[in-house]
Amino acid sequence: MLDKHGRKINYLRVSVTDRCNLRCVYCMPPEGIVKKEHDNIMRYEEIFKVVKSASLLGVNKIRFTGGEPLILKNIDKLIYNTSKISSIKDIAMTTNAILLEDRVEELKKAGLKRVNISLDSLKEDRFKSITRGGDINKVFKSIEKSLSIGMRPIKINTVIMKGINDDEIDDFMNLTKEYPISIRFIELMPIGEGRKLYKDGYISSEEIISRHSDLIPVETDKSSTALLYKFKESKENIGFISPMSCKFCSGCNRVRLTSEGTLKPCLHSEKEVNLKNYVGNSQALLSKINEAIYNKPLEHHMIEEKESKSKKMMYQIGG
């Protein structure tokens, strides 16, 4: 369906849990989070009702996120049932891949089309520091397994932080020359824990691109959040997601369901609609989703205000 600004909204990002097995420095506090009561989070059946209702309003792309979505025991069942909705054409997942190696085959059989893997360093010690304890070898094994079973495309999402991992930019780019893997560099945002790092850690996509004169622009879909490039010898592309330096609101086609059951029409707006109260009434649920999509804000104002208006943390929203 169209929002009141004429944008076609066909993409729903679903945060199935706010829990995670890592505590990345820009996402979670060092002490982790307090586990929510079961009644305060969306159950599998409730999530599926929202997905089903959204599909009736023109949503045909679903991405499951977290926290870490693979913590959810029924994620394969959720993917399978989603794949049986005839109007859903694309089912993706964003994961840290710590648990992916043992589950990627069943997920692909269930209907998962592609994965984005959050990976902010290729160095074992640095990865452990950024994630506060993560084992990078589990991520590498998951990538290898995903490639071996033909999961395509595989994208690596990398949040670039000045003085922390910006010296690895070339290493990440060069992966596209060796493997059929896409890279997405994401600008650090002043949201949640990222506020603490933003002043000293922010580096713009433009600055990175300007250092690499051999990058070749690639035609990009209007609704894409990334500007795409590649090297002459690349197997896949290199994308730059630039919410701070070059916002993409005019072509935004997505809304987000949080693990608590609120629908966020804009990642960086405090406006959201509680859907959990309506999952028992299909007509009311459809009406509330329709209302939220129609009233999606025209744009965020992070560039001007240097801060997200969202009161939620990234692990609660799913990015």
From Swiss-Prot:
Signal peptide: none annotated. Keywords: 4Fe-4S, GTP-binding, Iron, Iron-sulfur, Lyase, Metal-binding, Molybdenum cofactor biosynthesis, Nucleotide-binding, S-adenosyl-L-methionine. GTP binds at residues 13, 63, 94, 155, 254-256. It is an enzyme of class 4 (lyase). The keyword ATP-binding does not apply. [4Fe-4S] cluster 1 binds at residues 20, 24, 27. It catalyses: GTP + AH2 + S-adenosyl-L-methionine = (8S)-3',8-cyclo-7,8-dihydroguanosine 5'-triphosphate + 5'-deoxyadenosine + L-methionine + A + H(+). [4Fe-4S] cluster 2 binds at residues 249, 252, 266. InterPro entries: Aldolase_TIM, Elp3/MiaA/NifB-like_rSAM, MoaA, MoaA_NifB_PqqE_Fe-S-bd_CS, MoaA_twitch, MoCo_biosynth_MoaA/MoaC, rSAM. One of its GO terms (molecular function) is cyclic pyranopterin monophosphate synthase activity. SMART domains: Elp3. Pathway: Cofactor biosynthesis; molybdopterin biosynthesis. Residues 4-227 form the Radical SAM core domain. One of its GO terms (biological process) is Mo-molybdopterin cofactor biosynthetic process. It comes from the Bacteria. PANTHER family: MOLYBDENUM COFACTOR BIOSYNTHESIS PROTEIN 1, MOLYBDOPTERIN COFACTOR SYNTHESIS PROTEIN A. Belongs to the radical SAM superfamily. MoaA family. Monomer and homodimer. This is GTP 3',8-cyclase. The gene is moaA.
